[in-house]
Design a protein with these regions (language model features):
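Short intrinsically disordered, low-complexity coil segments enriched in acidic
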Residues: 1-7, 182
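C-terminal accessory regions of radical SAM enzymes
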Residues: 3, 22, 193-266
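Short, solvent-exposed loop/helix junctions and linker helices
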Residues: 4, 64, 97, 158-162, ...
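Short catalytic/ligand-binding loop motif for oxyanion handling, primarily in non-cytosolic enzymes
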Residues: 6, 49, 95-97, 150, ...
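Radical SAM [4Fe-4S] cluster-binding motif and immediate context
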Residues: 15-182, 200
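Short, well-ordered beta-strand elements within core beta-sheets of diverse protein domains
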Residues: 41-43, 185-187, 247-252
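Short, solvent-exposed turn/loop segments enriched in Gly/Ser/Thr/Pro and often Arg
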Residues: 89-96, 121-122, 185-189, 213-222
Length: 266
């Protein structure tokens, strides 16, 4: 009862309350097609049960703004703040396929001069959806691939397969969408062999941008309860963003994890 079920009942954000929106409140540069850009959130919750995340913080039921509400938010940002590019920051924007298709339809019909990027899961992506997104101004989709090893995907309860990831990336390439591939290293059960599987995967697929973080058991996640079965964890190390290793799987050393992380970025 603490959560708002109808997100459209919330007024559109009053961005004028923020000082110099265009200057200080913009997404990271790798998610921007053109400036000025702004980020928005169109839903709350996630249907994933990944061990490294805590989607229940925003409620177990996923709630969405309607396509019409999202459109009004974007129009307000364009007309009143000069925004030309939008970064949709939901964990996975494409879960509600019908809503995304309606959103794309509105943008196409209204001929908005806007570019946008979003996040998605491989198992929610299909060719018709991607084509509609592309026509509506989408230029990039960030996909949480995490690993090229099925063993690792299962160990973190990702709920996707290596084959689904291959297929989703191939469809994005076919449609002409840029892909930001999001990966983790040092997950439960990680080994030299599974890291090599991920490296081989990366070499084969269509990815135009790339991020790899160190797996980190965060508070209030399943990972924080499960890590003793899989390795060593020092909560004083690492960071919320996973930029340095804090969890070390039994089959690897901290130095080896850092080496592989640097190797992948070369």
């Amino acid at each position: 009862n603490l959560f708002i079920s109808n997100l459209d009942s919330i007024p559109i954000p009053d961005w004028s309350l923020l000082p110099e929106l265009k200057k200080f409140y913009r997404p990271a540069g790798d998610s921007i097609k053109r400036s000025p850009s702004a980020g928005i959130v169109t839903s709350r919750g996630c249907d994933g049960k990944c061990y490294f995340c805590n989607p229940w913080q925003l409620g177990k039921m996923i709630r969405y703004h309607s396509a019409e509400y999202i459109y009004r938010m974007i129009v307000d940002l364009m007309r009143n703040h000069g925004i030309r590019d939008i970064y949709i920051q939901d964990d996975t924007f494409v879960i509600n396929r019908d809503n995304v298709m309606q959103f794309c339809k509105i943008l196409i019909e209204e001929k908005l001069d806007i570019t946008w990027a979003c996040h998605g899961r491989a198992n929610h992506i299909d060719i018709d959806l991607l084509r509609a997104m592309k026509m509506a101004g989408c230029w990039q989709i960030a996909i949480g691939i995490e690993s090229g090893s099925q063993k690792i995907l299962d160990s973190i309860n990702k709920g996707t397969t290596v084959e689904q990831n291959y297929k989703a990336l191939k469809l994005c390439e076919e449609v002409g969408l840029d892909v930001k591939g999001l990966f983790m290293i040092g997950c439960f059960g990680e080994s030299h062999e599974t890291i090599k599987e991920t490296i081989d995967f990366i070499k084969k697929v269509h990815i135009t941008d790339f991020h790899m973080n160190f797996f980190t058991p965060l508070p209030l996640t399943s990972a924080i309860k499960l890590w003793p079965k899989y390795g060593h964890f020092d909560s004083s190390k690492g960071s919320f963003m996973g930029s340095t290793p804090s969890f070390i799987p039994f089959d690897l050393t901290e130095e080896e994890l850092i080496y592989y992380h640097k190797y992948v970025y070369r």
